[in-house]
Amino acid sequence: MHLLSSLAALAAAITVAFADVQQCNAENASVRKEWGSLTPDEQLGYIDAVWCLRSLPSRLPNEQYPGVQDRVDDFVATHINLTMVIHRNAPFLPWHRQYIHLWETALREECGYNGTVPYWNWTKNPDLYTNPVFDTTQSPETSLSLSGDGAYVAPSPTDPDPDPGLDFAPGRGGGCVLDGPFKDWPVRMGPFSAAQAYPYAPVPENAFAHNPRCLQRNLDVARIQYYNNPSVLESLLAAPSIAVFQDILDRTIPGTWQQAIGAHGGGHISVGPTLADVFASPQDPVFMLHHGFIDLLWDAWQRSGSDTGEGTDRMRALNGTTMYTNPPGAEEATLDTVMEFGVLGSPKKIGEVMDIRGGEYCYRYE
């Protein structure tokens, strides 16, 4: 009888615990907000927490990762190491969802942050110079932005053109960020060329070498208004399938692995050069806010219809392989495909991260 009673008690406890996990809903979920909607105290809290993470020691061995000097660099190195299996493919959206979650968890558990990771709505203020994410004009030294443009650097004829065939006026920056909270933000790994990204490409030689330099930006209003305008957002949310949704985010030249710019890449190149580095873009603090908005859009698409027209629940909709640009013969991804996160956290199956109010997640966007 004692054994039966114990088993019954254990079963009841498991049932209660399971019920607790399942209780997350829109009312009790933590809220991720747009940067411009945060209060000054909330903005300062996030900025301080990010700098706190920068002050903490790395968990990677320095002899193998000489460019990794702190916890922020742990996130950068992990992204570099996995670039070819987390971009332009099926794991892209779920992997970055978990990546942001791990970042938020580190801010909270290691730096005492009590907020969430904010996001950058590309369309809320498309004039990047006055967007709250980048605007330092109110008070350059104490700005509650993520810092603004870089110093002007005249473009060179040898600079790679990310979108050949389109004639955009050059930006006003290109050099080191001059003011705001992140003017002294260190950048340590890379830079890498987009030509180093192709299916089955190895991790670049000396990928983790220590190459200290400044955070560089070249805010490009013309590009953000071209690639990330309200019509693009409408198309994303109206996408009839996850394949179409992905293609709007990251376009590929038909019949090839060669990349073309979509909404995802548009956000990166509109802020670069640091954010435009496909391997090492998390070295720009705007990275998490950019990908936070992509996660918002994916979640909104997931919740906007019962199925994709292909008999697939949108919460389970997946398309593509586990390799960069989905080349022929690459392994098809499934909900059981395991994603790695290195020193940041334990591996996750794609199916474990498909719902932001399921599993270990409990958040929503507003």
From Swiss-Prot:
Which keywords does UniProt give here? Answer: Copper, Glycoprotein, Metal-binding, Monooxygenase, Oxidoreductase, Signal
The annotated phenotype of a deletion mutant is: Impairs the production of the gray-brown conidiophore pigment and leads to 'ivory' (colorless) conidiophores and accumulation of N-acetyl-6-hydroxytryptophan (AHT).
Give the Gene Ontology MF terms in alphabetical order: metal ion binding; monooxygenase activity
Tell me about pH and activity: Optimum pH is 7.0.
Q: Which residues bind Cu cation A?
A: 87, 96
Co-factor requirement:
Cu(2+)
Q: What is its EC number?
A: 1.14.-.-
- What does the Swiss-Prot or TrEMBL cofactor note state? Binds 2 copper ions per subunit.
Q: Which domain of life is it from?
A: Eukaryota
- Kind of enzyme, top EC level? oxidoreductase
How is activity regulated here? Activity is inhibited by 2,3-dihydroxynaphthalene, phenylhydrazine, diethyl dithiocarbamate and 8-hydroxyquinolene.
| Glycan-carrying positions | 28, 81, 114, 121, 319
List of residues binding Cu cation B? 291
Pfam families (UniProt xref): Tyrosinase (PF00264)
Which pathway is it part of? Pigment biosynthesis
The signal peptide stretch is: 1-18
Q: What function does the entry list?
A: Nonribosomal peptide synthetase; part of the pathway that mediates the biosynthesis of the gray-brown conidiophore pigment. The first step of the pathway is performed by the nonribosomal peptide synthetase ivoA that catalyzes ATP-dependent unidirectional stereoinversion of L-tryptophan to D-tryptophan with complete conversion. While the stereoinversion is catalyzed by the epimerization (E) domain of ivoA, the terminal condensation (C) domain stereoselectively hydrolyzes D-tryptophanyl-S-phosphopantetheine thioester and thus represents a non-canonical C domain function.
Identify the PANTHER family for this entry.
Answer: N-ACETYL-6-HYDROXYTRYPTOPHAN OXIDASE IVOB-RELATED, TYROSINASE FAMILY MEMBER
Protein name in UniProt: N-acetyl-6-hydroxytryptophan oxidase ivoB
Q: Say which species the protein is native to.
A: Emericella nidulans (strain FGSC A4 / ATCC 38163 / CBS 112.46 / NRRL 194 / M139) (Aspergillus nidulans)
Upper classification of the source organism reads: Eukaryota, Fungi, Dikarya, Ascomycota, Pezizomycotina
